[in-house]
């Protein structure tokens, strides 16, 4: 209408959280990536998602890590240092030493889903992870040979136990992911959610004992 003064309402502008110049570090990036992975999964982790969580531009992240693969390598190294993965302990009873090591490794991975995703599911090892793995393998095989096994039998036995441990962890992780999806869907539909099912140790122990008992001496 004539004489009316139209006042256009201004939309409130979204306030972006910006970090102070120079405050972004690789440590902050890696820790944020861990938080994202713990809430979702390694598969969903991306550089843009990390940048968004930190309130910075994607380009700022690339000043510290060149790509997603390098970020995952940095996470893997940090996860390994934090995990307390048990070292192989030599003894005169190689079966007990290998059994204790297998149980310890399995227990560590089962308690840390992000570590499992980074090392076992991702399939690409950082130089540190590869080096640590090779050291433990050589130590275990050397102990088995010292106890009377020939080199080929020692290698085959260690490989069999490693595959058993790896398979048990991966199966438990897949079940965990499947149950998480089911709980989410059930919650969205307003239904009841069941408690997570703990991994079955009995099958693992039976197979581990059988593998070790089949080896002479």
Per-region residue spans from a language model:
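Amphipathic alpha-helical interaction segments
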Residues: 28, 70, 100, 156-163, ...
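Hydrophobic alpha-helical connector segments
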Residues: 85-121, 125-126, 132-135
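C-terminal peripheral helix-coil segments that are non-catalytic and often amphipathic
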Residues: 1-13, 146, 174-217
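Alpha-helical DNA-contacting segments of helix-turn-helix folds
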Residues: 37, 72-79, 129-133
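DNA major-groove recognition helix of helix-turn-helix
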Residues: 65, 76, 158, 165
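Helix-turn-helix
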Residues: 28, 32-70, 74
């Amino acid at each position: 209408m004539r004489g009316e003064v139209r006042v256009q309402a201004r939309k409130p502008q979204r306030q972006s959280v910006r970090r102070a110049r120079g405050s972004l570090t690789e440590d902050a990036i890696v820790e944020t990536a861990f938080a994202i992975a713990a809430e979702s999964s390694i598969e969903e982790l991306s550089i843009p998602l990390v940048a968004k969580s930190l309130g910075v531009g994607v380009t700022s992240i690339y000043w510290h890590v060149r790509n997603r693969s390098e970020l995952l390598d940095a996470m893997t190294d940090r996860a390994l240092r934090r995990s307390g993965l048990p070292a192989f302990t030599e003894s005169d009873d190689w079966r007990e030493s290998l059994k204790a090591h297998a149980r310890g490794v399995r227990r560590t991975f089962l308690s840390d889903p992000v570590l499992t995703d980074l090392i076992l599911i991702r399939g690409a090892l950082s130089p540190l992870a590869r080096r640590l793995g090779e050291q433990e393998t050589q130590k275990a095989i050397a102990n088995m040979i010292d106890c009377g096994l020939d080199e080929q039998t020692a290698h085959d036995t260690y490989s069999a136990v490693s595959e058993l441990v790896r398979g048990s962890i991966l199966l438990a992780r897949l079940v965990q992911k499947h149950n998480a999806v089911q709980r989410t869907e059930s919650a969205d539909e307003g239904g009841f959610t069941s408690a997570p099912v703990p991994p079955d140790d009995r099958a693992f122990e039976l197979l581990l004992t059988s593998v070790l008992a089949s080896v002479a001496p």
